[in-house]
Amino acid sequence: MKKDIHPKYETTVIRCACGATVEAGSTVDDLTVEICSQCHPFFTGKQKLVDTAGRIERFRRKYAKFNQAQEAKQDQ
């Protein structure tokens, strides 16, 4: 076997945006992740509300003109 062809495998600290840290083995020195099992809604059982009301209103305003044009076309 050839010597010195494999990457260095060492203990790595994985940091989440929520502040949690986990130690694991990796070839990368430090890892940063956006979400982990300690803050993900699936694992915690908590749901984060997303502002869907604003999105729905924006969608309705966007397509209101389209719907009015379709109704006017059908009335003719």
UniProtKB/Swiss-Prot annotation:
GO MF annotations, alphabetized: metal ion binding; rRNA binding; structural constituent of ribosome
The keyword Glycoprotein appears for this protein: no
One GO location term (cellular component): ribonucleoprotein complex
Biological processes, Gene Ontology terms: translation
Residues reported to bind Zn(2+): C16, C18, C36, C39
Disulphide bonds in the chain: none
Named cofactor requirement(s): Zn(2+)
Xref: Pfam families: Ribosomal_L31 (PF01197)
Cofactor note: Binds 1 zinc ion per subunit.
SUPFAM superfamilies registered for this protein in UniProt: L28p-like
Keywords: Metal-binding, Ribonucleoprotein, Ribosomal protein, RNA-binding, rRNA-binding, Zinc
Domain of life: Bacteria
Function: Binds the 23S rRNA.
Family: Belongs to the bacterial ribosomal protein bL31 family. Type A subfamily.
Record's subunit section: Part of the 50S ribosomal subunit.
Protein name in UniProt: Large ribosomal subunit protein bL31
Lineage: Bacteria, Pseudomonadati, Thermodesulfobacteriota, Desulfobacteria, Desulfobacterales
Name of the gene encoding the protein in the UniProt record: rpmE
